[in-house]
């Protein structure tokens, strides 16, 4: 099934048209016949016998964009003056900047912001180091740290190539929750180097967001940093995903009248996210969970288990089910996919209990397309923005860090994650809850602040806030 045109492959065309009837119509027809979508037209400017126009077009991929450009260039009465890839254009020069909060308009301002006045603040922090969380950027700043070993669905592409993703993460922190974040892309080859480096730079930040670090190193890095630092450390690929999955599962149960404790769940993919999803579902009361990796079902005592999978095996699959994904899916209620494309099909869904919940979150191509699950799944969710019910971490991480920073949390506990999931779930009202709307829109500006409030309260209740 071909991909649909998407904003990820959006192009901007500046064209000059013969100012006669039907030229614009022929241009629109040519773009449509090439299989692209016109998103907007504007900038109409009459220049003598020419009409100059800006056209924004969504394409399927780079080859398709080139074909659309060729189709436009081949039209009589149409001159292509200029075109560019809008995604690359957005990234030119980066997506974030450092902005001053204090104005320095005269020597009085300068004396307070810098020398000699700044020395007083330095000495206050020297005498009471906790003041660094009030009198410096630590109060509102998070490091987004990666080694570039597991970037999106691209794999180990290295730290430099990971930078656009980390910049994007920093942008989302700011846009959705007002948290200042800065990308830290580390050229390292060993998990211990990540740990040592982050410990050394930690005095600059109020929190650490680990991102796109391959498992099992991700587990080791997060555990070590949580033990070593007195600021919150959060591996978003694990816990952000887990929080939003739980929110979607709670609302799927609310929609269908089921109880989460009665569900039998299969998780395909035992990387960082899969293990974290299993952990949070256990905390939410799900009793029957079976994980599946490339070797089949994960069970206690199985060979080839790293420490994270061994923990998972010891706490799930009480019946020690064995076999392939297709075999363990039979008679279950929930499929959660965190693996790869086309892993299951409609025939697999028919072996599950009636009207299962299907969360197929592999990107860019899910384990099963929603079209194939139509009529079989009670709720279908993916990780994609072009289908309903997008399981998107941006619903979780901005609000989680906002809440943690606001109360000076030194850790992010399981209760804080559960509180975040509940806040996300409760952001969908009973009136709005449908099979195609079990999680709120990422553009619901209230969600991060509901999450922040819930996380802050949980942090206080758990006693992890700085005195």
Regions found by a protein language model. Give the residues of each.
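Glycine-rich phosphate/diphosphate-binding loop of Rossmann-like nucleotide-binding domains
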Residues: 152, 159-177, 229, 235, ...
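Short glycine/serine/threonine-rich phosphate/pyrophosphate-binding segments
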Residues: 24, 135-136, 152-154, 194, ...
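A conserved regulatory-domain signal marking ACT and ACT-like small-molecule sensing domains
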Residues: 1-92
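Rossmann-like adenosine-cofactor binding region
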Residues: 310-379, 384-386
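Glycine/serine-rich phosphate-binding loop and adjoining beta1-alpha1 elements at the start
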Residues: 80-263
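General beta-strand structural signal in soluble alpha/beta enzymes
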Residues: 80-83, 183, 209-212, 233-236, ...
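Adenosine-phosphate binding glycine-rich loop
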Residues: 232, 236-237, 258-262, 360-467
């Amino acid at each position: 099934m071909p991909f649909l045109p998407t904003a990820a492959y959006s192009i901007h065309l500046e064209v000059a048209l013969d100012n006669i009837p039907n030229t614009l119509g022929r241009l629109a027809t040519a773009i449509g016949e090439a299989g692209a979508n016109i998103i907007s037209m504007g900038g109409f400017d009459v220049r003598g016998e020419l009409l100059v126009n800006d056209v924004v077009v969504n394409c399927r991929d780079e080859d398709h964009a080139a074909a659309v450009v060729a189709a436009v260039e081949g039209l009589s009465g149409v001159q292509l003056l200029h075109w560019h890839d809008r995604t690359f254009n957005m990234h030119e020069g980066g997506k974030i900047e450092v902005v001053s909060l204090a104005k320095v308009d005269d020597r009085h301002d300068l004396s307070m912001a810098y020398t000699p006045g700044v020395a007083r603040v330095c000495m206050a922090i020297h005498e009471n180091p906790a003041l660094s969380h009030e009198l410096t950027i630590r109060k509102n700043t998070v490091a987004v740290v990666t080694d570039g070993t597991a970037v999106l669905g691209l794999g180990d592409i290295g730290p430099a190539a990971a930078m656009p993703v980390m910049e994007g993460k920093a942008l989302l922190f700011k846009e959705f929750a007002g948290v200042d974040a800065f990308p830290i892309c580390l050229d390292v080859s060993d998990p211990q180097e990540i740990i040592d480096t982050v410990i050394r730079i930690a005095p600059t930040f109020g929190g650490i967001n680990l991102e796109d670090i391959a498992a099992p190193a991700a587990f080791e890095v997060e555990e070590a940093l949580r033990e070593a630092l007195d600021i919150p450390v959060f591996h978003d690929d694990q816990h952000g995903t887990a929080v939003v999955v739980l929110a979607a599962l709670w609302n799927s149960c609310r929609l269908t009248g089921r109880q989460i404790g009665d569900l039998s769940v299969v998780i395909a993919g035992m990387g960082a996210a899969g293990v974290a999803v299993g952990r949070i579902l256990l905390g939410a009361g799900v009793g029957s969970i079976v994980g599946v990796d490339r070797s089949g079902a994960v069970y206690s005592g199985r060979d080839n288990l790293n420490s994270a999978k061994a923990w998972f095996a010891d706490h799930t699959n009480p019946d020690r089910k064995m076999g392939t994904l297709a075999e363990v899916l039979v008679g279950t209620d929930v499929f959660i996919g965190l693996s790869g494309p086309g892993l299951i099909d409609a025939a697999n869904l028919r072996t599950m209990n009636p009207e299962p919940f299907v969360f197929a979150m592999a990107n860019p191509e899910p384990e099963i397309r929603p079209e194939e699950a139509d009529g079989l799944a009670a709720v279908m969710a993916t990780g994609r923005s072009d289908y309903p019910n997008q399981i998107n971490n941006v619903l979780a991480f901005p609000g989680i860090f906002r809440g943690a920073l606001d109360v000076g949390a030194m850790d992010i506990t399981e209760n804080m994650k559960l509180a975040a999931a509940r806040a996300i779930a409760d952001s969908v009202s009973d009136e709005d809850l449908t099979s195609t709307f079990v999680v709120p829109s990422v553009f619901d500006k209230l969600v991060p602040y509901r999450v922040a409030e819930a996380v802050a309260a949980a942090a206080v209740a758990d006693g992890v806030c700085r005195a």
